[in-house]
Structure formats: structure tokens, C-alpha cells
């Protein structure tokens, strides 16, 4: 999707206005303590810009986790975020115990100039997502009239709307698409994310390499399909490589992952690659295990030898790493989505770590390297490479849908320029 034609915060006049801002404060918590404040820090530039440019107030709304519909458990409260935000901004943050309704509307109607207000978790109301589950696990659907009321109440909390929640941009939730204000702009985090993906997908540097890992082919069909129209080379690694190798080379894969559904379209994908002149690199050797366990016995295998019955491949071997390194060395732009082994376990992390080292090396020689959220972003955190690649996405699902060529509802809803 083209992202260059949307209103962004730097072009929005906020002076004297109440800004209602959707952020992504869905942070990990343990015993009501925040264990990683990255997402809160990521929203600070947009908040500060509004305050520095004379906004009357900044009203922040976010979800946290996925609470049941009904009584609101403390562990899903955004109260601890207000405390963290106060220390990051160096100014008071008013926390409200709800996100809609007469009391919230009153508190946000005419606040003191320069106020920062944080609303309670949006998902305490089923109207945010439109559906949910009650405490017994029964499905609950929101009534259309109540969704309208919920959206109207959110719309009363500001004069202009800013969306800086890239991580939720693929969800058509009320706070993402239902705030009805004349000007709706993307915040700085949203802008940074969209700029990277726009550049990568709309005018890539070439050769352009996609590294695709992860487990199931079926989950990645749309991704592979869309990227085959854009890239010059593709590494297909991780668990899904076994489905390709079994279909294409009739390789014995033991108890490695095999995706029945995905297997049906492997040949179509390969013929599309051939037609588009895309060079595909698959692994040629493996680190194997006698069970799916951190402390499993390990072995080695190649495509030619196959993996014996009762064993499974959990990482690529050193020959595969050499092939991957050659592909990385040829690239001027890389998008990486999905690890190439079970990186969480030391015995099976070498392949992903070796690939990460090559991607870092490529970045230092001027290659544009984009890590698409989720597990691959976790790899960056694990090996401290977040600042050694060009961009690590904050949105797993959102970045995946962009790479699949889908329109993101949260971006689509912003004002055109």
C-alpha cells in the first residue's frame, strides 16, 4: 500500500488543541511491574512533539493484553504505565479509571494547558474489538449501537487524532478506525515504520533479498507469494524448509515439521520464482535432535543423507550458513521475517546467530536491513543487534501483513494529503 499520501504529525497543527492519541502500551508485566518499557519509550517523541508545539492536552489510549469481558482484573490495568510514563516524560500524568463515558469526557473536555492524560485499557470494553469472551470462555459480540456510542465517546476526547500504534495497525478496532475527527495523522513511530516498509516495497535497493523462516508454509504462503513479485533472491529456512525439501527432493525428513496444506503449493511457488527470475536458497544440511527438547541428543544430517526416522531437524548446518552468507553478501536490501532454527535453545541457535552476524556485517557496508517484528525482533534483543541493523519493526502482525501486500486498516483510516 502507498503510505506517502497520508497526513503525519509533523504536518499537523496542534497548537491549543486537544490531541487524542492511540499508542501501543501493550507492555509485558510481572506482578504489576513493567518488565520491558520499549513500547512506552517509542511513543515519547510523538507525545513530546505535541507538548512542545503547544497542544492543550494529550489524551493517550491503548490496550493491554486480552482481558475477558466483565469485571476488570488489576493485572490488565494501565495504571503502572502512567507511573512509568511520568518518569520518562518528567511531568505528571493523570490516569483515568475508564476510557469512555461522562466522567472521562468531563475530565478531557477542558483540561489545564499541557496536560497528559492516560485512559484505562480500551479492551475492558467489548466495543473496542467488537467481540470477545466472557470469564467462562463464551463468545460475546458487541451490539452495533453500543459500538457507535463507544466510538462517539472516544471522539469527544480530542480535537485532532493521532495514531502511533503501528503494532495494532492491522486491526480494524474502534480506537484505530472509529475515532471521528476532521484530522487524523500518523505519529512518528507509525511514520518511521511505514517509511521503511514503503521504501522497501515500493522502491527497493537491488539486489533485494528476503529471508523467510518460521514453521508453517501455509502461514507464509501469502508472504512468499507477494515477495516473489518484489525480490531478486529468497532464503527459505526454518521449519518450513522441510516441506519444500520433501516435495522437491523427496528428502527423508524424519519427524521434522511437514505441512500437508503447504506441500500442495510448493511447486507453484517454485515455478513462480523461476518465471520471475528469483534465486531461491534452501538449507543443505541440518542439526538434528531425537526429540523436541532443549536437552535432546543432537546429530547432523544433509539433504542427501536425509534425517533418520524418529529424529527431527531443529537448525541449519554450517554448509547452509555458508550459502546464506553468500546470498546476504550479494544483497543491497534485506527483509528478514522468521528465524532459521529453534534459536531459543542454545544447541539449535547457531544457524540464526550466524545469519544475524552476516546481516549485521551487511548493514555496516551500507545494505538496508529490515527485521520484521515477532520472533526475529526477539533474536535482535537476545543478541543485542537492535542498533546494528537499519530497522527493527515494533509490529509482528502488522509488518507481516504489509509484506503480504495487505492494506492496514489503521493506516487506511488516516487523513489523505
Swiss-Prot record:
Annotated segments matching region Linker:
187-190
Q: In which pathway does it act?
A: Carbohydrate degradation; glycolysis; pyruvate from D-glyceraldehyde 3-phosphate: step 2/5
The record lists ADP as bound by 214, 238, 343
Q: Where does CDP bind?
A: 214, 219, 238, 338, 340, 343
Q: Where is this region: Globular domain-2?
A: 191-417
* Modified residues annotated as Phosphotyrosine in this record: 76, 196
In the record, N-acetylserine modifications are located at 2
Return one GO MF term: phosphoglycerate kinase activity
The chain residues annotated with the modification N6-(2-hydroxyisobutyryl)lysine are 97, 216, 220, 323
Main localisation: cytoplasm
Q: Which cysteines are joined by disulfide bonds?
A: none
Pfam families tied to this protein: PGK
| Binding-site list for AMP | 215-216, 220, 239, 313, 344
Report residues binding Mg(2+).
Answer: 215, 218-219, 375
Residues annotated as carrying N6-malonyllysine in the record are: 131
EC code(s) of this entry: 2.7.11.1, 2.7.2.3
Instruction: From the UniProt entry, list the residue stretches annotated as the region Mitochondrial targeting region exposed following cis-trans isomerization by PIN1 and recognized by the TOM complex for mitochondrial translocation of the protein.
Output: 38-43
* Residues that coordinate or bind (2R)-3-phosphoglycerate: 23-26, 38-39, 62-63, 65-66, 122-123, 170-171
Tell me where in or outside the cell this protein is found. Cytoplasm, Cytosol; Mitochondrion matrix
The record's region (Associated with globular domain 1) falls at 406-417
- N6-succinyllysine: residues bearing it: 6, 48, 191
CDD domains per the UniProt record, alphabetical: Phosphoglycerate_kinase
Please name the HAMAP family in this protein's record.
Answer: Phosphoglyc_kinase
Subunit structure, interactors included: Monomer. Interacts with kinase MAPK1/ERK2; the interaction is direct, occurs under hypoxic conditions, and promotes its interaction with PIN1. Interacts with peptidyl-prolyl cis-trans isomerase PIN1; the interaction is direct, occurs under hypoxic conditions, and targets the protein to the mitochondrion by promoting interactions with the TOM complex. Interacts with mitochondrial circRNA mcPGK1 (via its 2nd stem-loop); the interaction is direct and targets the protein to the mitochondrion by promoting interactions with the TOM complex.
- What name goes with this protein? Phosphoglycerate kinase 1
Q: Which organism is it from?
A: Equus caballus
Gene name as annotated: PGK1
Amino acid at each position: 500500500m502507498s503510505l506517502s499520501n497520508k497526513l503525519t504529525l509533523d504536518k499537523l497543527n496542534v497548537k491549543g488543541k486537544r490531541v487524542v492519541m492511540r499508542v501501543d502500551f501493550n507492555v509485558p508485566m510481572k506482578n504489576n511491574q513493567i518488565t520491558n518499557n520499549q513500547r512506552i519509550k517509542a511513543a515519547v517523541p510523538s507525545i513530546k512533539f505535541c507538548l512542545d508545539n503547544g497542544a492543550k492536552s494529550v489524551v493517550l489510549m491503548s490496550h493491554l493484553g486480552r482481558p475477558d469481558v466483565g469485571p476488570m482484573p488489576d493485572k490488565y490495568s494501565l495504571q503502572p504505565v502512567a507511573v512509568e510514563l511520568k518518569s520518562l516524560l518528567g511531568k505528571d500524568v493523570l490516569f483515568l479509571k475508564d476510557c469512555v463515558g461522562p466522567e472521562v469526557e468531563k475530565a478531557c473536555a477542558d483540561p489545564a494547558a499541557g496536560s497528559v492524560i492516560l485512559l484505562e485499557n480500551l479492551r475492558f470494553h467489548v466495543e473496542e474489538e467488537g467481540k470477545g469472551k466472557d470469564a467462562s470462555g463464551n463468545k460475546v459480540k458487541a451490539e452495533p449501537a453500543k459500538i457507535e456510542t463507544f466510538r462517539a465517546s472516544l471522539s469527544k476526547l480530542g480535537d485532532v487524532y493521532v495514531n502511533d500504534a503501528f503494532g495494532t495497525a492491522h486491526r480494524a478496532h474502534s480506537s484505530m478506525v472509529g475515532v471521528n475527527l476532521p484530522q487524523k495523522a500518523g505519529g512518528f513511530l507509525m511514520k518511521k515504520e511505514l517509511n521503511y516498509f514503503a521504501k522497501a516495497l515500493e522502491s527497493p535497493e537491488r539486489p533485494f533479498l528476503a529471508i523467510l523462516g518460521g514453521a508453517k508454509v501455509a502461514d507464509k504462503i501469502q508472504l512468499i507469494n507477494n515477495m516473489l513479485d518484489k525480490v531478486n533472491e529468497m532464503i527459505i529456512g526454518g521449519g518450513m524448509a522441510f516441506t519444500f525439501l520433501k516435495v522437491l527432493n523427496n528428502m527423508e525428513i524424519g519427524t521434522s515439521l511437514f505441512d500437508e496444506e503447504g506441500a500442495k503449493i510448493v511447486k507453484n511457488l517454485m515455478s513462480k520464482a523461476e518465471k520471475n527470475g528469483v534465486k531461491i536458497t534452501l538449507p543443505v544440511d541440518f542439526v538434528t535432535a531425537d526429540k523436541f527438547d532443549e536437552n535432546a541428543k543432537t546429530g547432523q544430517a544433509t539433504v542427501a543423507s536425509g534425517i533418520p526416522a524418529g529424529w527431527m531437524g531443529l537448525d541449519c548446518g554450517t554448509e547452509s550458513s555458508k550459502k546464506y552468507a553468500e546470498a546476504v553478501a550479494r544483497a543491497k536490501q534485506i527483509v528478514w521475517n522468521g528465524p532459521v532454527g529453534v534459536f531459543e535453545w542454545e544447541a539449535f541457535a547457531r544457524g540464526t546467530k550466524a545469519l544475524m552476524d552476516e546481516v549485521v556485517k551487511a548493514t555496516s557496508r551500507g545494505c538496508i536491513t529490515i527485521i520484521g517484528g515477532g520472533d526475529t525482533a526477539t533474536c535482535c534483543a537476545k543478541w543485542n543487534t537492535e542498533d546494528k541493523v537499519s530497522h527493527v519493526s515494533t509490529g509482528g502482525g502488522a509488518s507481516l501483513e504489509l509484506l503480504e501486500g495487505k492494506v492496514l486498516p489503521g493506516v487506511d483510516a488516516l487523513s489523505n494529503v
